[in-house]
């Protein structure tokens, strides 16, 4: 295996076992699944870049399976490869052309055949040239992230055919020998498509569940048994809340599901009581103390402990060997969570690990409703600078940097955040500026879109020609592929001077990293003191 797609990849990439817990066989099967998706894209070129929505949505699902910490279940991945090959053959027959590339023509049906195929379709096979391979990796990981966002929107019935068309263009490009400038153009096109994907998901979520509003979320526990729901899928949240109503079972969010509390549609459920725990990487301890069932709707899963294995469930694209998987919902119906609910009734209430409050719900509609107050605070000097600290959290101690930055920033700064990076500072007592909290949480990682909308609105209000003239600095934490997608979206929107940490991606060669620095002033993080001083000076 060779996997370098996440921030915690070891130097040179993970080659024996992933830091995430993924073993060599799972890694190889995921490589083969990506190759099968590339085959679908190649065959779809016969439709002049257009692809039927059914196939586009399926590609989203295939790529989502391979996002870090999403699916470790070899049986499920093998079945997905079989489906992908059948889809590819269907597309090839409909297109009436047969591309010469092996990805469009190979066949197999067994796990052994898929593992054998992996040798020819690993990341290393993208190009013999390290720099071209680096650019192709950037494209692939960007597409993986936007596929996750697009899949969430599709679950709610929202689609954008331009995104599916980019799958065809982008994935096909991975199989071809293209020059660096053309690949760099595709990187930027991936960023443009990422903006579309995040806008689509924002539209899907808000039209379905309402615009997020300022909300105080409790972090303590009640006296009744509970179900803990983690991941990002709001439709799963809706199904679970409806089915648990009146059962005597409470529902708690974990990690990236925290922002579900901000949506008006979910506020009517009295048994939707709070958030339990912190970021994804501490789940092994928190799932143990929760006592009740856990539902993982997407990433992030860490290796499962025996102490809670019997009460942990997966659904959607998530999977883990030995865990019960809740099947997809039938057309027009809901998922059946009855087994989880009945198990919850037999469990003890959660053990309290903290008892406080978190304030969030500052997506673009809510912040723009406060625009006059924010603009006045900027003009008066009460707010000197905004610092965007969106992105991911991770287990390495180096991420203490983000806590320290939040504590070191002057009291006339406001932190704009989205994603699980917030857990590094969203429980600190950082105060407010004239009633505006100094940490404004927009929501999940895809809600970084809200931060971009807010920035563009402020640019308009202040009459600035360039988004980089705003008093906004970007100190982004990344971990997996959705953060890569967010980064590419920001670069496409013209944002420069982004700090990216805690380390630059392992898949970027020195030459490609230098190119990104030159084009976009992308920079690694430094010391807390130096970075805060530079950001406050507009650098």
Swiss-Prot record:
Family: Belongs to the HCP family.
Organism lineage: Bacteria, Pseudomonadati, Chlorobiota, Chlorobiia, Chlorobiales
Tagged with keyword Aminoacyl-tRNA synthetase: no
Record: residues binding hybrid [4Fe-2O-2S] cluster: 232, 256, 300, 392, 420, 445, 480, 482
Gene name for this UniProt entry: hcp
Cysteine persulfide modification, residue list: 392
Domain of life from the UniProt record: Bacteria
Reaction equations catalysed: A + NH4(+) + H2O = hydroxylamine + AH2 + H(+)
SUPFAM superfamilies: Prismane protein-like
Organism whose genome encodes this protein: Chlorobaculum tepidum (strain ATCC 49652 / DSM 12025 / NBRC 103806 / TLS)
Name assigned to this protein: Hydroxylamine reductase
Residue stretches spanning the membrane: none
UniProt key word Iron-sulfur: yes
GO biological process, one term: response to hydrogen peroxide
UniProt binding sites for [4Fe-4S] cluster: 3, 6, 14, 20
């Amino acid at each position: 295996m060779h996997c370098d797609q996440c921030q915690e990849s070891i130097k040179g990439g993970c080659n024996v076992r992933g830091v995430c817990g993924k073993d060599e066989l799972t890694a190889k099967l995921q490589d083969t699944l990506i190759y099968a998706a590339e085959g679908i894209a190649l065959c779809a070129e016969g439709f002049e870049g257009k692809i039927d929505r059914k196939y586009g949505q399926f590609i989203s699902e295939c790529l989502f399976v391979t996002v870090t910490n999403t699916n470790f279940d070899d049986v499920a991945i093998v079945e997905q490869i079989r489906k992908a090959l059948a889809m590819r053959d269907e597309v090839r027959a409909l297109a009436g052309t047969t591309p010469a590339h092996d990805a469009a023509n190979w066949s197999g049906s067994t796990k052994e055949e898929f593992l054998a195929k992996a040798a020819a379709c690993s990341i290393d096979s993208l190009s013999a040239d390290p720099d071209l391979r680096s650019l192709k990796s950037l494209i692939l990981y960007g597409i993986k992230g936007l596929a996750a966002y697009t899949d969430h929107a599709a679950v709610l019935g929202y689609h954008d055919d331009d995104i599916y068309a980019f799958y065809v263009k982008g994935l096909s490009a991975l199989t071809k020998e293209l020059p660096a400038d053309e690949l760099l153009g595709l990187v930027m096109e991936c960023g443009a498509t990422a903006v579309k994907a995040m806008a689509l998901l924002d539209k899907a979520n808000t039209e379905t569940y309402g615009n997020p509003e300022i909300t105080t979320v409790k972090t303590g526990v009640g006296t009744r048994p509970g179900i803990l729901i983690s991941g990002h899928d709001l439709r799963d949240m809706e199904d679970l809340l409806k089915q648990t109503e009146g059962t005597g079972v409470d529902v708690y969010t974990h990690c990236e599901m925290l922002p579900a509390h901000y949506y008006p549609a979910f506020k009517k459920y009295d048994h939707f009581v709070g958030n339990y725990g912190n970021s994804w990487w501490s789940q092994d301890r928190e799932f143990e103390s929760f006592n009740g069932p856990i539902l993982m709707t997407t990433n992030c899963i860490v290796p499962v402990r025996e102490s809670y294995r019997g009460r942990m469930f997966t659904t959607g694209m998530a999977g883990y060997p030995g865990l019960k998987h809740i099947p997809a919902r039938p057309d027009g119906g809901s998922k059946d969570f009855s087994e989880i609910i009945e198990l919850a009734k037999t469990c003890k209430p959660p053990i309290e690990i903290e008892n406080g409050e978190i304030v969030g719900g500052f997506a673009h509609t809510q912040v723009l409703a406060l625009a006059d107050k924010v603009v006045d605070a900027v003009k008066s000097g009460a707010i000197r600078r905004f610092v965007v600290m969106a992105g991911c959290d991770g287990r390495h101690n180096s991420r203490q940097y983000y806590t320290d930055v939040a504590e070191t920033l002057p009291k006339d700064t406001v932190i704009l955040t989205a994603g699980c990076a917030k857990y590094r500072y969203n429980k600190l007592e950082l105060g407010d500026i004239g009633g505006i909290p100094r940490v404004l949480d927009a929501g999940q990682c895809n809600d970084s879109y809200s931060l971009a909308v807010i920035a563009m609105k402020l640019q308009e209000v202040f009459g600035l020609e360039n988004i980089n003239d705003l008093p906004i600095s970007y100190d982004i934490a990344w971990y997996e592929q959705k953060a890569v997608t967010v980064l590419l979206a920001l670069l496409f929107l013209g944002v420069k001077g982004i700090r990216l940490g805690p380390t630059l991606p392992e898949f970027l060669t020195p030459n490609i990293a230098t190119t990104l620095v030159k084009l976009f002033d992308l920079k690694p993080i430094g010391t807390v003191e130096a970075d805060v001083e530079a950001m406050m000076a507009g650098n």
